[in-house]
Amino acid sequence: MPLSSILPVILIPSLLWMASLHYTLAGLVFLFILPSLFLIAVRVIVKHKPKTKFFYNWSCVTALYLFFIYEVKCVGTFWDLPKLISWWENLALVLGMGGSLASYLKLKWDFGDSKETEGKICRICEIYVKGKDHHCVWLDMCVSTSNINLFMVFLTLTILTSGHLSMMLTSYACPGTLLGPILLPSMCWPEKQTDCLLLVSGVYSGIISTILSLLLIGQACRKLKNI
């Protein structure tokens, strides 16, 4: 198995577990270790191995691990836990995940069927891409004028889903004020190790949602300029 596949499987659970040990370590992981890791990955891995699947594998492992944390540690799929997550919250998350997955598979399917003979050639995909915008290493495909709208739909669904997951995990670990049907998280550091893991996983999901929101805003601004 290539190193680009092994590293995300080891690093993601290990870093989140490390962050759950103490709030100081959580700050260290999110403010220093993760940014440094991706800076090194961009400068070293991409430079010497541009076709690496490291970032794509990181995306896949992140999605699977966060879903595992939610289902096993929060909902209690395999054993009985206090039912703090309502059915509609769970349904909203499942529908969001399903929508994100469906839009991603559609993107992948359309890109795999592309047989362009003109446009820019992507040095990573090694195919012609007409109206190329950029190569998304996290999805392992090129984004162009032909799929930019679907890409933005994927971003929107993923932002909403990861944001919703972040809210549920953090409010489960640190329940705060009830705003209508929504339980907001409070500032705390839980006593139980499981709750600490839920909290840092929720923070991680929130960071992902924030970064993707900035990307979506950037894409929307560029699209408006081209109108």
Describe the residue ranges of each PLM region.
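Cys/His-rich microdomains that often coordinate metals
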Residues: 129, 143
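Short amphipathic alpha-helical segments embedded in low-complexity Lys/Glu-rich regions
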Residues: 139-141
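Short metal-coordination and nucleic-acid-contact micro-motifs, chiefly zinc-binding Cys/His arrays
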Residues: 118, 132
